[in-house]
């Protein structure tokens, strides 16, 4: 009985709640059908008390039986046409959806998301489509919460473009859609965005730490918060530190330790919170501001940028997407290890030289670091 009730409820919802021109025709016929059945009905109702008599007389319709019959069969015809049209339309739609590939890219590192894989979220949202997924898991390169083997982890990310190319070549460009979600160290999230910058259909999700689930970015809202810029001058004219405080403040003492006598540009949000990143518009706008700052540094003659970024995964990914691999200068995105004697021990180096792959760049051992170690 429960199964029968479920089938009836789902059928009613499909016929009377789903929006389509075909079902509009079906509903028009369904609304007229009972009216035609009532065309010849007549009845009398009386309510009698000691003091009054109330009666209701409903006479049969004066509409000729021929017109009632025409209306009856016409309503059935509308329902039949609408239902047949909707079935054909649904079959065609399902065939078109089956051609489409939704490629889910999940990256695991800082938090174990295996209990709520990204592919499950994608399957619920994109029902009927061909779902393909890949998981880049670098937890075997981590020890005690730090990245102990960055070169090994980097190899897994460099295969990402090949994985996408394999799947994209099997369908038309408009039928290929990427859904990205990760929780990995900032340099790898930035690199992932950089590698996928040429992909037009990318939906970016982030991990909601409060709900322990994947969450989509809001495409509409924007608090219009802007970066506040500060400058620390130094003698170097080729290399510069670009420090971005998005979700929390960067470690300025660690920057001084790892990059001494190097000029610094700091871009800071006043409201630095772990949940200040859910606006897609905000991320895109601030990514544009970041790139404009890089272009200004390039015009000033700096050709080696040391990027220190404190942000959520989706923000780092968005910033990486915005970084033009052909026209912007060499950049290294550094990993922060708070308890390490070298707080910024390594970074992922990205160059604009043709055919040059991103690589791991170790922090140079200076006199200040020697004293700290």
What is each residue range found by the language model?
Residues 1-97:
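N-terminal alpha-helical membrane-insertion module
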Residues 58-78, 84-174, 185-186:
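N-terminal topogenic membrane-targeting module
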Residues 108-112, 174-191, 245-250, 306-317:
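Gly/Ser/Thr-rich loops at beta-strand to alpha-helix junctions
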Residues 162-169, 283-301, 315-318:
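A short, acidic, amphipathic alpha-helical segment used as a generic capping/interface helix at domain edges
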Residues 168, 172-213, 316-319, 324:
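Hydrophobic, ordered structural segments
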Residues 198-228, 270-279, 330-356:
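Long, charge-dense
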Residues 223-292:
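Redox- and metal-dependent alpha/beta enzyme cores, enriched for Fe-S-associated oxidoreductases
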Residues 298-300, 313-373:
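C-terminal functional regions that serve as terminal interaction/effector modules
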């Amino acid at each position: 009985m429960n199964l029968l009730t479920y089938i009836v409820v789902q059928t009613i919802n499909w016929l009377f709640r789903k929006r389509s021109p075909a079902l509009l025709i079906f509903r028009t016929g369904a609304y007229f059908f009972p009216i035609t059945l009532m065309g010849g009905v007549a009845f009398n109702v009386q309510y009698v008390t000691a003091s009054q008599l109330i009666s209701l007389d409903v006479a049969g319709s004066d509409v000729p039986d021929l017109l009632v019959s025409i209306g009856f069969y016409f309503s059935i015809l509308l329902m039949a046409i609408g239902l047949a049209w909707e079935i054909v339309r649904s079959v065609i739609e399902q065939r078109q959806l089956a051609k489409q590939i939704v490629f889910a890219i999940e990256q695991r590192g800082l938090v174990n998301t295996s209990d709520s894989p990204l592919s499950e979220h994608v399957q619920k949202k994109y029902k009927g489509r061909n779902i393909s997924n890949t998981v880049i898991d670098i937890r075997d390169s981590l020890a005690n919460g730090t990245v102990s083997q960055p070169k090994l982890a980097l190899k897994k990310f460099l295969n990402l473009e090949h994985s996408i190319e394999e799947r994209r070549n099997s369908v038309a460009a408009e039928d290929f859609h990427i859904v990205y979600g990760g929780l990995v160290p900032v340099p790898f999230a930035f690199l992932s965005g950089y590698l996928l910058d040429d992909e037009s259909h990318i939906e970016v999700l982030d991990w909601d730490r409060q709900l322990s689930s994947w969450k989509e970015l809001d495409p509409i809202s924007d608090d219009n918060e802007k970066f506040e810029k500060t400058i620390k001058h130094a003698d170097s004219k080729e290399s510069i530190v670009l420090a971005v405080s998005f979700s929390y403040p960067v470690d300025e003492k660690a920057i001084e330790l790892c990059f001494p006598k190097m000029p610094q540009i700091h871009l800071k949000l006043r409201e630095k919170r772990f949940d200040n990143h859910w606006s897609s518009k905000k991320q895109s706008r601030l990514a544009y501001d970041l790139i404009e700052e890089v272009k200004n540094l390039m015009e000033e003659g700096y050709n080696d940028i040391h990027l220190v970024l404190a942000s959520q995964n989706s923000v780092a990914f968005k910033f990486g997407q915005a970084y033009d691999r052909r026209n912007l200068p060499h950049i290294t995105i550094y990993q922060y290890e708070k308890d390490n004697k070298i707080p910024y021990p390594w970074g992922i180096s990205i160059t604009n030289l043709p055919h040059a792959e991103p690589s791991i760049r170790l922090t140079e051992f200076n006199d200040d670091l020697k004293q700290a170690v």
